[in-house]
Each structure stands twice: as C-alpha cells, then as structure tokens.
From Swiss-Prot:
Protein name: Small ribosomal subunit protein uS15
UniProt xrefs under SUPFAM superfamilies: S15/NS1 RNA-binding domain
Protein family per UniProt: Belongs to the universal ribosomal protein uS15 family.
Keywords attached to this entry: Ribonucleoprotein, Ribosomal protein, RNA-binding, rRNA-binding
Protein source organism: Corynebacterium aurimucosum (strain ATCC 700975 / DSM 44827 / CIP 107346 / CN-1)
Molecular-function GO terms, alphabetical: rRNA binding; structural constituent of ribosome
Stored InterPro entries: Ribosomal_uS15 (IPR000589), Ribosomal_uS15_bac-type (IPR005290), uS15_NS1_RNA-bd_sf (IPR009068)
Protein purpose: One of the primary rRNA binding proteins, it binds directly to 16S rRNA where it helps nucleate assembly of the platform of the 30S subunit by binding and bridging several RNA helices of the 16S rRNA. Forms an intersubunit bridge (bridge B4) with the 23S rRNA of the 50S subunit in the ribosome.
Gene: rpsO
Length: 89
C-alpha cells in the first residue's frame, strides 16, 4: 500500500533538512526505506507477486545509489542516517 500524505509528511519532517525538504538524500532514503518495509511485508503474504518484487528490487537499488552518493560526499551524514534508520551497513 502506498504511503499516505500524512505519513510522508511525518517522515520528511523527521529526516529532511527542513520541513518541506523532499530532495535531500536523507529524505529520499527515508521515504524509500518506508516503502521498502511496506512492500516487504506485502511480499511475505503474497510470495508469487513477482511484479511487486521487481518494484522492490528497483527501490532497493535506488536507495543503494543514494546511500553510496551520501557516503562518498558526506560520511558523517551517511553514518547518522543509517543508524537512525536501522540499516545494517
């Protein structure tokens, strides 16, 4: 299920650089992580939903690219973000 507008605003307020920030890597990674977690739960119940699985893999790849960019340009922000999101890196 897609993220509601309220949930997106809450995530952006917590992880964005300012309240209306939607473009920073932190905000984008946080939104992708939330969508990835929702889709992972969906796929636990619907194992043969290959169309959604492909979308999940695309989102994971996009998040990996954003994290790689952040790690290359600002390691402190990268480390802070992965610890706040609970990612395993």
């Amino acid at each position: 299920m897609a993220l509601s507008t309220e949930k997106k605003a809450e995530i952006l307020k917590e992880y964005g650089l300012h309240e209306t920030d939607t473009g920073s890597p932190e905000a984008q990674v946080a939104l992708l992580t939330s969508r990835i977690n929702n889709l992972t739960e969906h796929l636990k119940d619907h194992k043969h939903d290959h169309h959604s699985r492909r979308g999940l893999l695309l989102m994971v790849g996009r998040r990996r690219g954003l994290l790689k960019y952040l790690a290359a340009n600002d390691v402190d922000r990268y480390r802070d973000l992965i610890s706040r999101l609970g990612l395993r890196r």
